[in-house]
Amino acid sequence: MEIDNRSRRLGDELKKIILPHSQVKMAAATFSLYAFKELREALEEIDEFKFIFTNPAFMVDEIKEQYREYAIPKAEREMALFGASYELKLMNELTQKAIAKECAEWVRRKARFKTIKVDEPISDGVRIECGSNVFSVDRLKNFDLKELGYEASTLKTRRNLYEAPNSLDYLAEFEDYWNDNEYFRDITQEVLDKLNIAYKEHSP
């Protein structure tokens, strides 16, 4: 199935196929909590969520935490956790606080994040496994509102949603990446730390 985010939006299709007890695997350059908000109902019902940043993120030499550092982070892909500029314009501070809290609670229960440690290209996309059903999306540059089709994009981009058996080849190497401790590392706690900063920053 072709998805152009005009006649058919990626987010709507993902809501249909992210079923209870699914395992969701994503590889993308950025993760936005506003994209999480759009898929939250479906993501609350899954068993496991694994996300790989396809570019180095949260590297040790970049982390010098200050209370407001998240507002102007060193790395754009880390800033995207709190929304791209167009997403931030859509949300007031109370909404941002609520979403950050919900996302942090969900991450603690369901999600793990890893990042590649070297500047080497790897495949991006989505793989959803539920029993014998496997769905895949062949491209996912960023996990954000624009990529999901909920914010207008200047240029039309196409991606494809596959069912088995065509879906089986996409992100087949994901677990190899996930279990590779030499070139990938777990950053789940760093993601939680950033979300906690956002929540505290917007607390009265």
Where are the regions that the model predicts?
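PLD/PLD-like phosphodiesterase catalytic module centered on the HKD motif
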Residues: 1-204
